[in-house]
């Protein structure tokens, strides 16, 4: 069975409490359950992780280069600032990476409109709330 790493960045551990008007009321644990169910239906193993620390995300991306068939990543605010995450994803190419955001980053503050991850991802899904994770897994499964 192929494994997909589902990586989550800063503040996503606070889902369900943090700005539910923007991010919804679903917790990250519930999203993890959704991903595991979607993965099972797609024949994929899911390794679901979250960290508030950029270096952890870089380490996990590099680990995925050796252990995973693809990555779904919600880098949170690091999407807009992290050259380190961009470079880590570039270093594991051609491993497919799908970027996910719960909110539509293009309909929010202008500083959120630019993603450092998008140029090295196979695609981005944003604005569909937690469903975006399932959509990203379906898209990756179609590529694997």
UniProtKB/Swiss-Prot annotation:
- EC code: 4.2.1.10
**Pathway the protein acts in:** Metabolic intermediate biosynthesis; chorismate biosynthesis; chorismate from D-erythrose 4-phosphate and phosphoenolpyruvate: step 3/7
Which SUPFAM superfamilies does this chain map to?
A: Type II 3-dehydroquinate dehydratase (SSF52304)
- Does the UniProt entry include the keyword Transmembrane? no
The reactions it catalyses are:
3-dehydroquinate = 3-dehydroshikimate + H2O
Q: Where is this site: Transition state stabilizer?
A: 18
What HAMAP family does the record point to? AroQ
Q: This protein is called what?
A: 3-dehydroquinate dehydratase
This protein's encoding gene: aroQ
């Amino acid at each position: 069975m192929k494994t997909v790493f589902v990586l989550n960045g800063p503040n996503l551990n606070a889902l369900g409490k943090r700005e539910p008007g923007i991010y919804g009321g679903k917790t990250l644990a519930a999203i993890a359950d959704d991903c595991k169910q979607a993965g099972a239906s797609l024949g994929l193993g899911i390794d679901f992780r979250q960290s508030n620390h950029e270096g952890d995300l870089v380490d996990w991306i590099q680990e995925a280069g050796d252990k995973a068939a693809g990555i779904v990543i919600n880098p949170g605010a690091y999407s807009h600032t992290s050259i380190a995450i961009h470079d880590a994803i570039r270093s594991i190419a051609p491993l497919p990476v799908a970027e996910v955001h719960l909110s539509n980053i293009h309909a929010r503050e202008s500083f959120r409109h630019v993603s450092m991850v998008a140029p090295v991802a196979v695609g981005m899904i944003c604005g569909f709330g937690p469903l975006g994770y399932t959509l990203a897994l379906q898209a990756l499964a179609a590529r694997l």
